[in-house]
């Protein structure tokens, strides 16, 4: 029989997480975060902590995976948490392995952010851009175009509060939601 290691998924009150999303491993989801159907959040190499007010759209993949040169369970690897700040947007079909992400970032459709990239705050990774460097992206950087050109914007992207409010109202009408955590962590006996 397959090994059953269902790690904990903690969903804060006020978060909207559709049942059709795939969440594996030790994942903590903050309040006012919206996770669409078909979004995937996979914590293999350590926990994933998602802050408040994030929007994770369809077919977005957020994965805390083992680096390519490490074979799990054979080497003594310390689990490293992936930390995602507040008010970030993961658009349709994006792929993020960034271990540390600040606030107010946007990863646009089909964009890829590698494991060794640190996104500070206010950054936009443009559609179809691939970023797999060993660097911390400076605040308010926009990476765009087929050549992944860079520039710095004067203001950081606006939080998607109106869109989050709309989705929190509409998604429960059309999708089943995963249950959020209650005040106590002990199971209730019938």
Curated annotation (Swiss-Prot):
Protein name as it appears in the record: Dynactin subunit 6
Phosphothreonine: residues bearing it: 186
Post-translational modification: Phosphorylation at Thr-186 by CDK1 during mitotic prometaphase creates a binding site for PLK1 that facilitates its recruitment to kinetochores.
General function of this protein: Part of the dynactin complex that activates the molecular motor dynein for ultra-processive transport along microtubules.
Compartments reported by the entry: Cytoplasm, Cytoskeleton; Chromosome, Centromere, Kinetochore
SUPFAM superfamilies from the UniProt entry: Trimeric LpxA-like enzymes
InterPro entries: DCTN6, Trimer_LpxA-like_sf
Protein's GO biological process: lipid biosynthetic process; mitochondrion organization; mitotic spindle organization
Gene Ontology, cellular component aspect: centrosome; dynactin complex; kinetochore; mitochondrion
GO-annotated molecular function: catalytic activity; dynein complex binding
Main localization (coarse): cytoplasm
Family (UniProt): Belongs to the dynactin subunits 5/6 family. Dynactin subunit 6 subfamily.
Subunit architecture: Subunit of dynactin, a multiprotein complex part of a tripartite complex with dynein and a adapter, such as BICDL1, BICD2 or HOOK3. The dynactin complex is built around ACTR1A/ACTB filament and consists of an actin-related filament composed of a shoulder domain, a pointed end and a barbed end. Its length is defined by its flexible shoulder domain. The soulder is composed of 2 DCTN1 subunits, 4 DCTN2 and 2 DCTN3. The 4 DCNT2 (via N-terminus) bind the ACTR1A filament and act as molecular rulers to determine the length. The pointed end is important for binding dynein-dynactin cargo adapters.
UniProt gene name: Dctn6
Organism taxonomic ancestry: Eukaryota, Metazoa, Chordata, Craniata, Vertebrata
Gene induction: Up-regulated in Ant1-deficient mice.
Key words of the record: Centromere, Chromosome, Cytoplasm, Cytoskeleton, Kinetochore, Phosphoprotein
Keyword check for Heme: no
């Amino acid at each position: 029989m397959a090994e059953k290691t269902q790690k904990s998924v903690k969903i804060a009150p006020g978060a909207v997480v559709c049942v059709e999303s795939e969440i594996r491993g030790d994942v903590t989801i903050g309040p006012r975060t919206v996770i669409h159907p078909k979004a995937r959040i996979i914590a293999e190499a350590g926990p994933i902590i998602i802050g408040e007010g994030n929007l994770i759209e369809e077919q977005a993949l957020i994965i805390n995976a083992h680096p390519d040169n490490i074979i799990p369970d054979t080497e003594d690897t310390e689990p490293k948490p992936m930390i995602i700040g507040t008010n970030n947007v993961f658009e349709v079909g994006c792929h993020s392995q960034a271990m540390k992400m600040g606030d107010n970032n946007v990863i646009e459709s089909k964009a890829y952010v590698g494991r060794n990239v640190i996104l500070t705050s206010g950054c936009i990774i443009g559609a179809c851009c691939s970023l797999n460097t060993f660097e911390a992206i400076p605040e308010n950087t926009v990476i765009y175009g087929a050549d992944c050109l860079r520039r710095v914007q004067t203001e950081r992207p606006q939080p998607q509060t109106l869109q989050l409010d709309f989705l929190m109202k509409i998604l429960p009408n059309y999708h089943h939601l995963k249950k959020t955590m209650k005040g106590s962590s002990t199971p209730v006996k019938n």
